[in-house]
Amino acid sequence: MALNVAPVRDTKWLTLEVCRQFQRGTCSRSDEECKFAHPPKSCQVENGRVIACFDSLKGRCSRENCKYLHPPTHLKTQLEINGRNNLIQQKTAAAMLAQQMQFMFPGTPLHPVPTFPVGPAIGTNTAISFAPYLAPVTPGVGLVPTEILPTTPVIVPGSPPVTVPGSTATQKLLRTDKLEVCREFQRGNCARGETDCRFAHPADSTMIDTSDNTVTVCMDYIKGRCMREKCKYFHPPAHLQAKIKAAQHQANQAAVAAQAAAAAATVMAFPPGALHPLPKRQALEKSNGTSAVFNPSVLHYQQALTSAQLQQHAAFIPTGSVLCMTPATSIDNSEIISRNGMECQESALRITKHCYCTYYPVSSSIELPQTAC
């Protein structure tokens, strides 16, 4: 059966903060200039916030005394940006939920969500045979939107590198400190004023970047602390300031969604049962000053690796004891250290079993210096 995930209605993106000065009756700005809402008495205000009328945004509200706010132009622009951002988040959540349902019910056919460009399918790569443990891969889950995925590679065992298309163009769109210049204003025939046009009307043409016909916004002016006598950046009007703040809020939410999508993509890249917690390493007792025996069987590898690979890597790990200063009596080693130096154990025991000995028999007339670790 097919999975149909219905979008969840959310009215948070329609919520606006009410101007506190307006509630006290001391706000000197008009409804079109203030960046906060000035609701009439018919609107319901809860905890200093008011909900905007969705029908008013569409231009179809016919209520005489609407209990929702009919926002002015600059606040309507901010709400439209929030609405598009909320729609993207809903579709992203629906896609990730459908992906998780596919893992829970393997026989369920999964239909990709439209309007999203998806990354390429994960294919084979010859680099896996040389480095099967860790391979860099950019999370490219088929149903997760590529606009919210980070470009930083994620280390996933046994995964080939996958590139996400369109990430460079997305980074340019996420610039929140630039505004497009009104082309009609540049021609001198823009009928809208500076406070009504949704594009920038810079007073100085030197501010305009000719490569993309944009101007850089003075962020200090938006924060109310620009003290330059002649600023080289653009000082936007109130409605464009609201647009920039909404774009910054959208970029922050997109970054949070990107982290969540990357984490979900990393988890879903592993097959079920491949990730297990590492067991605690067994503590080996020390005796007579010797260090612990290093046993390769204590090492823990992931169950996804084959046993042949384990044997190849474990073959190069030496086993046995590491000696330091004082040898143990239980160690099967043919070396003993006396006050005269290092001598052959079999020579000391007067046992001759082979013609050539690798150790020099020390006589009483030769004194060798004792080496320390």
Swiss-Prot record:
One of its GO terms (cellular component) is cytoplasm. A zinc finger (C3H1-type) spans 13-41, 47-73, 176-204, 212-238. It is found in: Nucleus; Cytoplasm. Keywords: Cytoplasm, Metal-binding, mRNA processing, mRNA splicing, Nucleus, Repeat, RNA-binding, Zinc, Zinc-finger. InterPro entries: Znf-CCCH_Muscleblind-like, Znf_CCCH. GO terms for biological process: mRNA processing; regulation of RNA splicing; RNA splicing. Pfam families: zf-CCCH, zf-CCCH_10. Belongs to the muscleblind family. Mediates pre-mRNA alternative splicing regulation. Acts either as activator or repressor of splicing on specific pre-mRNA targets. Inhibits cardiac troponin-T (TNNT2) pre-mRNA exon inclusion but induces insulin receptor (IR) pre-mRNA exon inclusion in muscle. Antagonizes the alternative splicing activity pattern of CELF proteins. RNA-binding protein that binds to 5'ACACCC-3' core sequence, termed zipcode, within the 3'UTR of ITGA3. Binds to CUG triplet repeat expansion in myotonic dystrophy muscle cells by sequestering the target RNAs. Interacts with ITGA3. PANTHER family: MUSCLEBLIND-LIKE PROTEIN, MUSCLEBLIND-LIKE PROTEIN 2. This is Muscleblind-like protein 2. The gene is MBNL2.
